[in-house]
């Protein structure tokens, strides 16, 4: 029995595509364009896992489909290659992160090519290539010139033992560092910030124009966090000091019975009484040891210390105590809140814990039992009594503005982007600090500012990056003799990924980021596929940079990615014991269809879970390609279920996909292919062309494959296969299983030409119409026969056909026909006696 020999066929066609540059981006200006983009990977030492190809296969299917439909297709791939893991590896092994990264990229590229993806490798980019990051640095200098890149003192997660600050993501819940388990303290340090907040309103409003999953748009809206309210000024009793509170509910001001400042607030030391000084200092120290996440955890016990000072509530002149508490962050809002315990759960818990007064100002609950957080008419609120929320807010804001105690204010949860890292393996920030106190950007003519090669990439220990150790690189002298130091911080990994989709459009341009005409031709990206874990940060940062470049006149569109699709996760098989603990697969044995712990003998429950090294359930695509072939992997991952669903990996499913491809191979190579069409497959063939075309457009690849299976089943029942239908079917399967399709195309055409640019098949709508229909024949009300007849026969013709049927003749033989009722396309009812 013949089968699809993937080990021979797949490398053969991969070599053909590479030798012929089959997937070079089309430049015919008369054709429409299609830009299919994958989120480019970080080339880790572990290589690809089977989750990567799911999204890559989806964009590859669309790219191959669009080429066949006559589009110029831009389908590129590159490497997001700066980042912490390579630096960590280099520090642990003494190797150069550049060498390690190059090896990883070579491995990733080998794996990607083995899967038959139709990338245009002439456009490959690498964020660590100076020719690439020259333009990352150029964008930074433009941000700096426009005042959107600035330096500020910001609290960072400082690890003394590592001699560096670490990102929030690298702090464990217990407040220690992920690497080494060292204590992490919050300490203010000079950092570069990007003023993303200047774009908050546009980033919010323009989401409405995008074809993105609503859930992702909502995550961005929440992250930007626009809220309308008021800034209210509180004076500190007995001093000339005051502080501002932002509140979305200024109408509840009569219920404010205390205020809370962040421990880091500028005023704290100035207003703390001598009696409270020690307690306040201790509390500030404890707060500095916690991450923002730990501090704002709603479930945690409320802690705080009174400063000994009082604020004056501007609406009623009452003296209310000023506390500090770590749930208020200096970086959020104004770093101060007014507490209305009757109507806010966190304030209520705090008031109960510390015996502070609770004053009801909205009617409807029992505020001694719990905070009432619904709306109701105002009470105990002087001139606001009886008003609803909207009326009361409008009235109090007008009153505050008239009296000079506050004003209406729109705020955003979005913070400016902390853009510097005290690391070696990143883009150098192109700024020079001069001894006269000024700073300047490195001029464009001197870019790229190349990252110097060094063996010593350990942190400097001073809070600066390892670049501070490199005196020759670090110190510069101007023409007028003024000395300066280069900026030692490097950019975060997000920098290179915020604009890479633009460089693919014109990757070898040495004069500018990309040519304007080419940007006009290709933007926006038509489809961007990647994981939902990048829903906020990467996509928000890329949108910010794109809008900035739009303002500069560099790009012609307001948004970078017109359509976004998040593929689901491919889960591994895992096992749980009676406690619910996960058990590694190498500790499991299968007996009689059940699963048992090798050591304890306990029966285990099988359940899908995220693939991980510790569970030993990671599936390597190399192994799948070796055993089943790349086309099998592609078809299986698309047939598992909807592309956006998370589904468990199944060896049985993989085998099923392989068997299907073997059936396809046999159908085309073993069936007699003929030049005459007997019409037997007209309907199913045209249905298949129509369905597969429509389902690919909708990215419903699983249903497209199901329809291809329907055609194979129907074709196998026929003695012969019409050549045009055989060719059309091979074209339909080509985006899914391209190696097999190329081989079968040669079997059918012997042209020696790739199938890639052969025009996509079309369908004949008239062939989809049923030309025959089943009708029932009833005699004395009982069904006696079912007949296939031509569609739309008249009553007379239908009656004639029914009475001529042998079965019907036998039933009515010797009986008198009283009447015949014929209903076209439905039934014939014969009344006899």
From Swiss-Prot:
It is found in: Cytoplasm. Signal peptide: none annotated. It catalyses: tRNA(Leu) + L-leucine + ATP = L-leucyl-tRNA(Leu) + AMP + diphosphate. One of its GO terms (biological process) is leucyl-tRNA aminoacylation. It holds the Pfam family tRNA-synt_1_2. The keyword Ligase applies. Belongs to the class-I aminoacyl-tRNA synthetase family. Coiled coil: none annotated. A motif ('HIGH' region) lies at residues 41-52. It is an enzyme of class 6 (ligase). One of its GO terms (cellular component) is cytosol. The keyword Transmembrane does not apply. This is Leucine--tRNA ligase. It comes from the Bacteria. Keywords: Aminoacyl-tRNA synthetase, ATP-binding, Cytoplasm, Ligase, Nucleotide-binding, Protein biosynthesis. A motif ('KMSKS' region) lies at residues 610-614.
């Amino acid at each position: 029995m013949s089968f699809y020999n993937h080990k021979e066929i797949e490398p053969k066609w991969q070599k053909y595509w590479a030798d012929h540059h089959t997937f070079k981006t089309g430049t015919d200006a008369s054709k429409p364009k299609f830009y299919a983009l994958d989120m480019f990977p970080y080339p880790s030492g572990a290589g690809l896992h089977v989750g990567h190809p799911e999204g890559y296969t989806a964009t590859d299917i669309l790219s191959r489909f669009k080429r066949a439909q006559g589009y110029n297709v831009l389908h590129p791939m590159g490497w997001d290659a700066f980042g912490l893991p390579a630096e960590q590896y280099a520090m642990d092994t003494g190797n150069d992160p550049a060498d390690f990264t190059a090896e990883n990229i070579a491995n990733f590229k080998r794996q990607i090519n083995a899967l038959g993806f139709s990338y245009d490798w002439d456009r490959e980019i690498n964020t660590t290539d100076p020719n690439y990051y020259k333009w990352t640095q150029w964008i930074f200098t433009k941000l700096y010139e426009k005042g959107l890149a600035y330096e500020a003192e910001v609290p960072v997660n400082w690890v003394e033992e590592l001699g560096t600050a670490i990102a929030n993501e690298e702090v464990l819940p217990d407040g220690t560092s992920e690497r080494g388990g060292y204590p992490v303290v919050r300490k203010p340090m000079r950092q570069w910030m990007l003023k993303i907040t200047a774009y908050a309103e546009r980033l919010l409003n323009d989401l409405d124009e995008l074809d993105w999953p609503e859930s992702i748009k909502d995550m961005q809206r929440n992250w930007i966090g626009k809220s309308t309210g008021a800034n209210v000024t509180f004076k500190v009793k007995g001093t000339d000091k005051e502080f501002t509170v932002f509140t979305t509910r200024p109408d509840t001001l009569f219920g404010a019975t205390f205020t809370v400042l962040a421990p880091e607030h500028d005023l704290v030391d100035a207003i703390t009484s001598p009696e409270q000084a020690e307690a306040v200092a201790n509390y500030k120290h404890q707060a500095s040891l916690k991450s923002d996440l730990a501090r704002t955890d709603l479930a945690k016990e409320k802690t705080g210390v009174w400063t000994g000072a009082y604020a004056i509530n501007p609406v009623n002149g009452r003296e209310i105590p000023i506390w500090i508490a770590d749930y208020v962050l200096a970086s959020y809002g104004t770093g101060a809140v007014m507490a209305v315990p009757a109507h806010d759960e966190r304030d209520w818990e705090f008031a109960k814990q510390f015996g502070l007064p609770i004053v009801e100002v909205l009617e409807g609950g029992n505020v001694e039992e719990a905070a009432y957080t619904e709306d109701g008419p105002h009470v105990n609120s002087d001139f606001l009594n009886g008003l609803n929320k909207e009326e009361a807010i409008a009235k109090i804001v007008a009153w505050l503005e008239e009296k000079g105690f506050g004003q209406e204010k729109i705020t955003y949860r979005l913070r400016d982007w902390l853009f510097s890292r005290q690391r070696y393996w990143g883009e150098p920030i192109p700024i020079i600090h001069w001894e006269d106190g000024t700073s300047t950007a490195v001029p464009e003519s001197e870019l790229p500012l190349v990252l110097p090669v060094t063996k010593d990439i350990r942190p400097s220990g001073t809070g600066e990056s390892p670049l501070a150790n490199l005196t020759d690189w670090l110190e510069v002298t101007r023409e007028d003799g003024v000395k300066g130091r280069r900026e030692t911080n490097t950019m975060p990994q997000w920098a290179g990924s915020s604009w890479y989709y633009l460089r693919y459009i014109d990757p070898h341009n040495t004069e500018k980021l990309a040519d304007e005409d080419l940007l006009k031709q290709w933007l926006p990206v038509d489809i961007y596929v990647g994981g939902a874990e990048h829903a906020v940060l990467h996509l928000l940062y890329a949108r910010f940079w794109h809008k900035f470049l739009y303002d500069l006149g560099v790009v012609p569109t307001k948004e970078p990615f017109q359509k976004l699709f998040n593929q689901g996760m491919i889960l591994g098989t895992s096992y749980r014991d009676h406690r619910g603990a996960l058990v590694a697969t190498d500790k499991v044995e299968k007996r009689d269809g059940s699963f048992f712990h090798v050591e304890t003998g306990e029966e285990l429950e099988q359940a899908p879970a995220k693939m991980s090294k510790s569970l030993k359930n990671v599936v390597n695509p190399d192994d799948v390609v070796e055993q089943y072939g790349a086309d099998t992997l592609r078809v299986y991952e698309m047939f598992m279920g909807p592309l956006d669903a998370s589904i468990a990996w199944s060896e049985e499913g993989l085998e099923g996909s392989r068997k299907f491809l073997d059936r396809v191979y046999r159908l085309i190579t073993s069936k007699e292919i003929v030049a005459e069409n007997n019409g037997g497959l007209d309907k199913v063939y045209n249905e298949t062309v129509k369905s597969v075309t429509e389902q690919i457009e909708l990215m419903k690849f699983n249903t497209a494959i199901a329809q291809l299976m329907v055609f194979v089943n129907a074709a196998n029942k026929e003695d012969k296969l019409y050549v045009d239908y055989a060719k059309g079917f091979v074209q339909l399967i080509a985006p899914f299983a391209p190696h097999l399709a190329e081989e079968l195309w040669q079997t059918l055409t012997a042209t020696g030409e790739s199938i890639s640019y052969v025009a996509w098949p079309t369908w004949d709508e008239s062939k989809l119409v049923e030309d025959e229909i089943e009708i029932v024949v009833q005699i004395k009300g009982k069904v006696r026969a079912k007949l296939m007849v031509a569609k739309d026969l008249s009553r007379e013709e239908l009656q004639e056909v029914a009475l001529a049927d042998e079965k019907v003749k036998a039933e009515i033989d010797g009986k008198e026909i009283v009447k015949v009722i014929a209903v076209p396309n439905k039934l014939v009812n014969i009344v006899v006696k």
